[in-house]
Amino acid sequence: MGNYDQMAAAVSELSGGKNVVLLDDIGMPSIYVRIPKGKNSELVSGLSDNVHYAFNVDSVEKTAFYYSKYQNIIVNERAYSLGHRDPANSINWDAARKACENKGAGFHLATMAEWAYIALWCRKNGTMPHGNNNYGKDSAYTHEHGEESSKDSGKTGRCFTGSGPVTWNHNHHGDGICDLNGNVWEWNAGMRLVDGEIQIIPYNNAAMGSKCDMSASSTLWKAIKADGSLVEPGTAGTLKWDWVSGKIQLTSGAITYKTDSGVGGLYKDMTLASGLTAPEIAKMLLLYPDEPNGDYAGDYHWFNPVG
């Protein structure tokens, strides 16, 4: 057996095949969770039977995608998903993307489409993950805590990856994705705001990694019309986030809040501009809640409408 064959066999057996070990192009391991293909209607009642965007890469429908089980560490400018490590932190988007893509073909920074699918799956299945969002503990379940890996102002800051209880995993089981709630800030690829206009890399093409041009001037970025169709950025009537009456508002009109500062609020409290109906794509990419005023476990959205 190879250096990591026994590790891979053990990880697979202990998780019932739901976790896998994947090697990068220099033979170093990371542990991933396999996320099987799902439909929009399986996430939100009343939506279409279309397969979620996370499973469409370069016009090819995928049976699954693989998501890091653990928040990554960085070794020699490469990102690795391993348990009981102090996760990488204070890293910008470009460096995070590069660390993922440095591992070779197929490896990429987690995308907004993938993140959205997992979040919607958790809500549908009643397993919104708890986590280190209050100095090593969960703010709502204060008896739950992870193992400290760093201090912050004399209190627990970060926790070792995967050191919390199973409720800190996306499915509330040991074979799930750890630490999606809190611990460190995480970057996603494939979605950006430009002066409030929501722009995306279509489907899950951001998962193409280094083969996908996500530079500021890339022509791959598309805006979203009110009917859900994709158009060139700057087209009239595209979806935007505005800040209205102390809440994030989804609008297709002109932005009214033009202060260069971060604002945000509870995801459930987002509002719609008068006359606008949120298209399915907005709900599937977490641009607008599928159930306004519903229970999203206190999740927040933050944004800056300028720049």
Residues covered by each model-derived region:
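C-terminal, surface-exposed recognition/capping segments
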Residues: 1-2, 144-158, 162-164, 171, ...
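Charged, compositionally biased non-catalytic regions
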Residues: 1-20
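Polar/charged alpha-helical tracts
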Residues: 9, 94-95, 279, 283
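A short linear-motif detector with a strong N-terminal bias
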Residues: 9-14, 41-48, 155-157, 164-165
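Extracellular adhesion/carbohydrate-recognition regions
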Residues: 19-105, 195-258, 267
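Short aromatic-cysteine micro-motif
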Residues: 50-180, 184, 209, 225
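Flexible loop/turn segments at secondary-structure boundaries
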Residues: 117, 192-196
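Short secondary-structure boundary/capping segments
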Residues: 123-128, 192, 201-203
